[in-house]
Amino acid sequence: MSKPSSSPFFSETTSRLQDETVFFSLFPDSSLSSAALQSLHLEIIDFVSPFTSPYIWQHEPFSLSIALSSSCACTNTAIPHLHGKLKYGDNLEDEWFAVFLLFRISAAFPSNSIRVWDTDGEFLLIEAAFHLPRWLNPETSLNRVFIRGGDLHIVPRSRLPDPSLVASLRFLIERGNESRASDSVQSALKNRISDYPERAWRNMHRVRVRVPVSVAQVIRHEPFLISLAVEGFYDRDMDSMKHAAKMEKFLSKGREEKLVLVLVKMSRAMYGQLVQQKFQAPNCYPMPSVSDRDAFSEAELGMKIACGMEMMYQQRKKEGEDGKGISWSKYKDNLEKYGYFEGLLSGSKEYKRLMENAEEYHQKSSSFSRTRDIMSAPVRRIDEILALPYSEDDFKGQEVPASDNDSWLYDGEDELNSVLQERQKEMEFYNSKKERKNKGKEKQEAGSSSDANMNNFDLGDISKSMQQFMHKVSSYKGAEVPENRDFKEVSIDVDRFMKDIESMLGSQGRDEQADDDSDGSEGSSMDMDFDDVEDDSEGEESNEDAKESFEESYYGAMNEELKNSTLEKSFENVNQQHSSKQNEESSKTRDEKDDEFTPVDADFNLVKNLLESYSSQQGLPGPASNLLGLMGLQLPKDSGDKN
């Protein structure tokens, strides 16, 4: 068994919560007197009895007790209320059946607020996790979650940032309409408990077993003790196994003891715990022949029940727990402790009246608490039952119905898959809803941004951004967009670069009159020390003239090469808009026009090609939008006008 763990939802409690246990507290709107609280208690008992009477609980039954002070783990404040706990163990049906009962109680008694939690904390929120407000989490849920009027209520953080229990209860009374959880949260929880109580009743399994007469006698008088017998068998240890080997209480005659056939009702969880565990019958146990398969199967299951009953009985007796149930004397002591008699003298008229009311309440509530008392102290009750006269003949001649079909035990995979698929659909719906919301938000932001910038969008920004992008220095990994950092631009001495190119091409870099006998002082500019060059105005002018002359020669040679190719037709040329150029062009012959190679407008072609690529994407992701996005540009929507 895992270690007990305290819930993060209730970190203020000093005691550690029991594992596999659900806790609940019911707070009336007004501070009731002890008599009024007792009356409310009885009304609730009468209300839930029709739901719980056909049900066999796994460990202990659903019950409520009166707390005139802070006697439960949910609060340190002295608020008169009803509280209870239910250990559900391996049977989660018990926990959700209890939740169903609490919702029904809150609907039938709307002037009460109910809290429910377990070792996982606010498990109702876990069930509706996909529908909760984002601010609600284990740290902010303390004193916020209640059941009231048949609905779940969550005290809003905007109203009470750090609520106390008293403040939250007051808020529920005064502004309950503001605290009601959303319809999606209500639906998630209501769907979880919509099949109850029928689902709880369907969870019962009836099976034929052969048990010793003494065990049959106990089960006939107290059917719910089967849960303690199964618990004793399932949680057995080496010490309790010693009691099963002897069977002193329920098999006093040993192998001479007769087995009788009875029908036992238990939960499906109990049945699974019995069937799935292999257990060798004690030597003293009278098992039938294996050849009779039906009788042997019935006796084998009955043997496990009988051994569990024996182990439970002996263990409880050893621990001295018999006789510790709630009695009248203990109940009276509690009344005196909490001031029920208001300091009245014993024997006075008013004292007798209060005493009569207390006795009447105890008698009425004892029928409901009787099951709880017996299960908390079963030894005494078992002794009382076995002290009555009984024999094997009491169980002979009775028609025992057939066992329920237990195919559900082996078909659980289908049910599990169904639950998983339901959860998967819920998760997919949540994710799709979230995705639609994010897309809508992005569209709205993009739309407002593009609409605002539509008229102010400058196509020149594309070429400028591309130039900046091309001049960035990238690493060995390739072209990268710098994030929160600026790369230094390439530093180059243009004059020296041009002189070096000039020297290599030989177009303008050498003196035509130089002779081969030169001493090399006027050789290649590659050998020149630019730090030694005299920095005078004549030198600068000479360098500028040489640079311009080289550029004209270089571009002229390049155009001459390109004019004979078809490359020119794939680009847009420079628009000749100046009138002087138009006049010059008109004076030229057609042959001269054909020989010309009109320069290409690189920026215009860049923008044109990017826009055509962007338009062909038809609003979908693509290379153009990705590249422009990396450069921080967002184009307006394509209007479809190609002009």
Curated annotation (Swiss-Prot):
Q: Where is the composition biased (Polar residues)?
A: 446-456, 564-580
List the Pfam families hit by this protein, alphabetically.
SGT1
Q: Which InterPro entries match?
A: Ecd
Q: Where is the composition biased (Acidic residues)?
A: 528-543
Instruction: Name the segments for region: Disordered.
Output: 428-458, 501-600
Biased composition (Basic and acidic residues) is annotated at 581-592
Q: Which domain of life is it from?
A: Eukaryota
What does the sequence similarity comment in the record state about its family?
Belongs to the ECD family.
User: What's the protein called, per UniProt?
Assistant: Protein ecdysoneless homolog
Report the source organism: Arabidopsis thaliana
Question: According to the entry, what is the taxonomic lineage of the organism?
Answer: Eukaryota, Viridiplantae, Streptophyta, Embryophyta, Tracheophyta
